[in-house]
């Protein structure tokens, strides 16, 4: 159901460069049309928007970026008022959000629409008793109500807790009790509604449940039925201080329950570098990031940095991922900027590119795990576009990246984002030399940089474990080359120690990925009485190779790795599987493979 004021009908749609979008059956557009104005109308607005928060807005080199990136942080900064409402005032008819789904339904929101609808949502939430400091969980998949809810909660000074739709009742209860969740706003899917409803009896702080439909069971408020009658929104007096908590993300480690990553109201400012520089966005960009709203990558690629730049956030609500679906949407809606984890690109390069017109693409980025050079090379061969890698965590914004003024080195994460003081350290805390592997840390002796989390909510001990002596420890291992580029090796827990050698999973995975049989692979360590650990490869084969799985192919792949990298790294064990275990954001879960192997041994 479209929000109030949005009609459902078919009409022509245009992108930000004025190009006609392909007609779609049942396309949904604002009743008042709101087709885009010419791009140059917004050039001054974009410059003024970014100039409010940066002392310099254009950079031409690594040194220029390093020396001259400086932020202007307003008191009581609030992204909803200081950016989104400002856009609505200065460029009300500019397209802000373009939402579509598997059936090619399409809803467009201008910045004026976002203001009006988020105001209405804020008034509605306020009528339900939600206010400053209240914790609200959002289980909204890729529904447009997620963006309205986030902006509305910011306007109230409330704390948003984005969550995945795959949570069980146990998961939800844990989150409710750990964070003190007061309200849950969720999709009207039967599974989600059942889990949310069942969590209520064991969640003493949980007072309010809201469904966005179509199903609204007893005990749930009906968003689209109830919010039409709310009074006009009036901005509260003091909504927030800069150090108030704005956002909580639950992030899993290798053991124990998920930790609560707490970000304050300055966190969106940290994503200026993500959207404006790493994604290289401008007012005529239509940007698609492949990420579910329940994970931190949505904040990276579908919200803050993109709207600082005045770009269109493109949202594709799909039931099941396929590379074909994504590529069709890029073609159909003339996407100009694209970001996805390497897993997505691995599947894309196995498609027939001659079937798609991807000529609208100007810029592509990747993050989430290391990019295999073979994938970079094939994607460049097919599109002529260089994949620009980046690195960060739920606890940070973009920490390392390949910027537009840099020459990418396939497989490298790029160089440090100068808003962070990055170093590589040994186990004793001393700095590594070039070429030496160490842990990526952020030095915080001069204060917490923009974008870095406040700590793990309500857990000082876990915070101290990773943040002490003026260093935030990422737990990720890398090395730096003589040009200052960083190269990912793996999580500290992923590094394999075999016969005295330290073997990073990524270097072996990259070697395997150059063999035509391999679509995906994961390298893990398996305990061995003689060597301590041996290297194991879990491999997904291409469809033309599946019937060749056997001892001969195992030997061929082992010899291939010996040829591509140092022979001591070759996988002594190879297992063929149909798919690898992954997080919803596309990261390979090597810990799950290790746990499975451990159970087999027991």
Kindly label every feature range from the protein language model:
Residues 269-286, 293-336, 351:
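Conserved AMP-binding/adenylation subdomain of ANL enzymes
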Residues 93, 97-151, 168-173, 225, ...:
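Conserved AMP-binding/adenylate-forming core of the ANL superfamily
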Residues 32, 40-49, 151, 155-225, ...:
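Structural core segment of the AMP-binding/adenylate-forming
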Residues 224-225, 308, 335-340, 349-409, ...:
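Gly/Ser/Thr-rich phosphate-binding loop
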């Amino acid at each position: 159901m479209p929000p109030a004021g949005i009609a459902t009908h078919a009409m022509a749609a245009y992108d930000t460069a004025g190009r006609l979008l392909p007609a779609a059956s049942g396309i949904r557009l604002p009743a008042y049309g709101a087709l885009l104005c010419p791009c140059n109308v917004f050039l001054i607005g974009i410059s003024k928007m970014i100039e409010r928060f940066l002392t310099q807005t254009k950079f031409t080199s690594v040194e220029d970026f390093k020396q001259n990136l400086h932020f202007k942080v307003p008191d009581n900064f609030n992204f909803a008022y200081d950016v989104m409402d400002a856009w609505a005032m200065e460029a009300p008819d500019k397209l802000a959000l373009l939402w579509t789904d598997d059936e090619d339904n399409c809803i467009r929101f201008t910045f004026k629409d976002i203001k009006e609808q988020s105001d209405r949502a804020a008034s509605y939430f306020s009528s339900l008793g939600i206010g400053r400091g209240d914790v609200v969980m959002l289980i909204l998949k890729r529904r447009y109500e997620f963006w309205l809810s986030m902006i509305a909660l910011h306007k109230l000074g409330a704390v948003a807790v984005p969550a995945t739709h795959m949570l069980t009742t146990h998961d939800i209860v844990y989150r409710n009790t750990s964070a003190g969740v007061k309200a849950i706003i969720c999709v009207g899917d039967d599974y989600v509604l059942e889990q949310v409803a069942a969590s209520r009896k064991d969640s003493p702080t949980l007072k309010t449940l809201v469904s966005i439909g179509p199903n609204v069971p007893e005990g749930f408020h009906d968003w689209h039925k109830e919010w039409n009658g709310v009074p006009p929104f009036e901005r509260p007096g003091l909504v927030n201080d800069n150090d108030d908590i704005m956002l909580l993300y639950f992030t899993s480690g290798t053991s124990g329950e998920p930790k609560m990553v707490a970000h304050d109201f300055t966190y969106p400012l940290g994503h200026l570098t993500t959207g404006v520089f790493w994604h290289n966005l401008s007012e005529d960009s239509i940007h698609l990031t492949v990420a579910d709203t329940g994970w931190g990558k949505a904040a990276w690629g579908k919200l803050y940095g993109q709207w600082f730049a005045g770009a269109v956030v493109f949202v594709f609500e799909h039931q099941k991922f396929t590379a074909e679906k994504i590529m069709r949407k890029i073609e159909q809606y003339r996407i100009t900027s694209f970001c996805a984890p390497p897993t997505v690109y691995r599947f894309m390069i196995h498609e027939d590119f001659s079937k798609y017109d991807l000529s609208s693409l100007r810029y592509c980025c990747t993050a989430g795990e290391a990019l295999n050079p073979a994938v970079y090379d094939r994607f460049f061969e097919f599109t002529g576009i260089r994949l620009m890698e980046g690195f960060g965590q739920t606890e940070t914004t973009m920490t390392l990246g390949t910027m537009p003024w840099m020459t990418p080195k396939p497989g490298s994460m790029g160089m440090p984002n100068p808003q962070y003081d990055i170093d590589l350290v040994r186990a004793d805390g001393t700095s590594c030399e070039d070429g030496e592997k160490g842990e990526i840390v952020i030095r915080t002796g001069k204060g917490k940089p923009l974008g870095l989390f406040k700590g793990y909510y309500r857990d000082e001990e876990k915070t101290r474990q990773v943040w002490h002596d003026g260093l935030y420890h990422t737990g990720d291992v890398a090395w730096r080359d003589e040009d200052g580029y960083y190269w990912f090796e793996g999580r500290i827990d992923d590094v394999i120690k075999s016969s005295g050698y330290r073997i990073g999973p990524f270097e072996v995975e990259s070697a395997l990925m150059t063999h035509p049989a391999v679509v995906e692979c994961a390298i893990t360590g398996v305990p061995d009485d003689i060597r301590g650990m041996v290297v194991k490869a879990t491999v997904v084969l291409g469809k033309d190779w599946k019937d060749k799985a056997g001892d001969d192919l195992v030997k061929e792949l082992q010899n291939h790795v010996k040829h591509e990298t140092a022979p001591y790294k070759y996988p002594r064990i190879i297992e063929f599987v149909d798919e690898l275990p992954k997080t919803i954001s596309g990261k390979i879960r090597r810990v799950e493979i290790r746990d499975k192997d451990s159970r087999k041994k027991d």
